[in-house]
UniProtKB/Swiss-Prot annotation:
Catalysis performed (reactions): UTP + L-glutamine + ATP + H2O = CTP + L-glutamate + ADP + phosphate + 2 H(+); L-glutamine + H2O = L-glutamate + NH4(+); UTP + NH4(+) + ATP = CTP + ADP + phosphate + 2 H(+)
General function of this protein: Catalyzes the ATP-dependent amination of UTP to CTP with either L-glutamine or ammonia as the source of nitrogen. Regulates intracellular CTP levels through interactions with the four ribonucleotide triphosphates.
Protein name as catalogued: CTP synthase
Stored InterPro entries: Class_I_gatase-like (IPR029062), CTP_synthase (IPR004468), CTP_synthase_N (IPR017456), GATASE (IPR017926), GATase1_CTP_Synthase (IPR033828), P-loop_NTPase (IPR027417)
Gene that encodes it: pyrG
Organism: Campylobacter jejuni subsp. jejuni serotype O:2 (strain ATCC 700819 / NCTC 11168)
Length: 543
């Protein structure tokens, strides 16, 4: 297949309907039909990337192998496709304008007046084409909702691109809400009709409509939507609330979603093999066992902030045929609570990453309880750094211990800001406490060398090194390494002198890692760190 074919996914009525899940589900079916598939997310907001956005604004920032800070939908794409994506798979209005302005400053436009059409729209089209190079199919999700002023250049770009590549090489899928009105006792199609009307005014006619709803759509309702929105009857697909997002590809397959896609894009033999996926989904929905772990974090009121981590726990549960119940513990509130009361009914304690001092002492309290009571413990990113702080305070008995992130003048900064590091391209990066925040962290996949015969080595099946993804500014201070190891806190993973993992040698499972194992976990290939922690929690409960 020479010409890359495009599937453009837009959304209407309101945001957060699940365009990303729908796009990822279609991609999964196409990939399992033997096609080379990739996905791109185009975000209309003006931030260059979500790296400096609050979790309460944006949810999780997902990090790719090459260090791009991206939309959380890229996490869904990777988990469904079981492939690693890159910075080419996500861009924003801010990134587009930044690129165009830089080209203008370099004189690349030869003195022309820079306009939305053709320059901004052209940049968007170029980025879409680049993401699709070497692929049979590129699915392009346009963030936001049709009607948003920010999204107009993106919609113009996909309208123009479809015209450019020809009708058999591109299609438009529009995802809308079909709300159930309890007072009337029926589903209403009017919001969908209005949304499609708005899309048509922009110059785009959808080829397929995916209807998000609480309840199933009957045949008459689907026919009504097809007639009023100008699509074939087999191109109205329902997406009813499901027990798990991993059911969605299977639900789409049952509705024969690939037949109209194959017809529109002139594809043949789309018969996906979803047997393994189906088996895992059954374990997600109806597992044989159950275990409860405490999830200690500062953003527990907005669980989207930990999306990759909660999904990785689901993956581990599926692999172990176990439902993992999460007990959400607000680390800030924990500071004034009794640890024994909070953790009395859990079989594992997970301390997640985060930024800023709020809730830090609560996380340290949770780590101390896990260490002293020999409850399986996993610390991630800040969770590892605070494990060092807790150990230095309560085992080494050092005074005025902290991370320099929270107290620059403390006597014993067991975690500190390093001035120089090598990025994923092997280039030296220099930073200080005054360096701008955007894009200045240690980002992306780095090699971690593993200590032989350690818990970490056992977790990774005795391999000598692994690559995992990072997102942090501060590092463990090597000055204290000898003292930590003397008292039993062993460095079991390192990267060019930087401490990547620590573990306790007199504890059933106490592991803390600087990297984010959740970013590389997929339903069909769970990350070993997450899986081993859940397995340890199951063993703790059994014993």
């Amino acid at each position: 297949m020479k010409q890359t074919k495009y599937i453009f996914v837009t959304g209407g009525v309101l945001s957060s309907l699940g365009k990303g899940i729908a796009a990822a589900s279609i991609a999964t079916l196409l990939k399992n039909s033997g096609l080379k598939v990739s996905i791109l997310k185009a975000d209309p907001y003006i931030n260059v990337d979500p790296g400096t956005m609050s979790p309460f604004e944006h949810g999780e920032v997902f990090v790719t192998d090459d260090g791009a800070e991206t939309d959380l939908d890229l996490g869904h794409y990777e988990r469904f496709l079981d492939e690693s994506l890159s910075q080419d798979n996500n861009f924003t209005t801010g990134r587009v304008y930044q690129s165009v302005i830089e080209k203008e400053r370099r004189g690349e436009y030869l003195g022309k007046t820079i306009q939305v059409i053709p320059h901004i729209v052209g940049e968007i089209k170029d980025r879409i084409k680049k993401a699709g190079e070497g692929k049979d199919i590129l699915i392009v999700e346009i963030g936001g909702t049709v009607g948003d002023i920010e999204g107009l250049p993106f919609l113009e770009a996909i309208r123009a691109l479809r015209l450019e590549v020809g009708k058999n090489n591109a299609m438009n899928i529009h995802l809308t809400l079909v709300p159930f009105i309890k007072a009337a006792g029926e589903l209403k199609t009017k919001p969908t009709q209005h949304s499609v009307g708005e899309l048509r005014r922009i110059g785009i006619s959808p080829d397929m409509i995916i209807c998000r709803s609480e309840k199933a759509l009957d045949r008459d309702l689907k026919d009504k939507i097809a007639i009023s929105c100008g699509v074939e009857k087999n191109c109205v697909i329902e997406s009813v609330d499901a027990a798990s997002i991993y059911q969605i590809p299977l639900n789409f397959l049952k509705q024969d979603i690939l037949s109209p896609i194959a017809e529109i894009l002139d594809l043949k033999n789309l018969k996906p093999n979803m047997e393994n996926w189906d088996s895992l989904v059954k374990r997600v929905i109806a597992p044989s066992n159950e275990v409860k772990i405490a999830f200690v974090g500062k953003y527990v009121d907005l669980k989207e902030s930990y999306k990759s981590l909660t999904e990785a726990i689901i993956h581990a549960g599926a692999a172990l045929d176990t439902k993992v119940e999460l007990k959400w513990v607000d680390s800030e509130k924990l500071e004034n609570m009794e640890s024994s009361e909070v953790f009395k009914d859990v079989s594992g304690i997970l301390v997640a990453g985060g930024f800023g001092y709020r809730g830090v002492e609560g996380k340290i309290k949770a780590i101390q309880y896990a260490r002293e009571n020999k409850i399986p413990f996993l610390g991630i990113c800040l969770g590892m750094q605070l494990a060092l702080v807790e150990f230095a305070r309560n085992v080494l008995k050092l005074k005025d211990v902290n991370s320099s992130e929270f107290n620059e003048k403390c006597q014993n900064p067991v975690v500190y800001l390093i001035d120089e590091f090598m990025d994923t391209n092997g280039e030296k990066q220099i930073r200080t406490a005054k360096t701008p925040l955007g894009g200045t962290m240690r980002l992306g996949a780095y090699k971690c060398d593993i200590k032989e015969k350690s818990l970490l080595a056992k977790v990774y099946n005795e391999v000598k090194s692994v690559k995992e993804r990072h997102r942090h500014r501060y590092e463990a201070n090597p000055k204290y390494r000898a003292d930590f190891e003397k008292y039993g806190l062993i460095v079991s993973g390192e990267s060019k002198g930087l401490i990547e993992a620590v573990e306790l040698n007199c504890h059933p499972f106490f592991l803390a890692v600087q990297f984010h194992p959740e970013f590389t976990s997929r339903l069909e290939h769970v990350n070993p760190v997450i899986c081993s922690f859940i397995k340890a929690a199951i063993n703790y409960e059994d014993n």
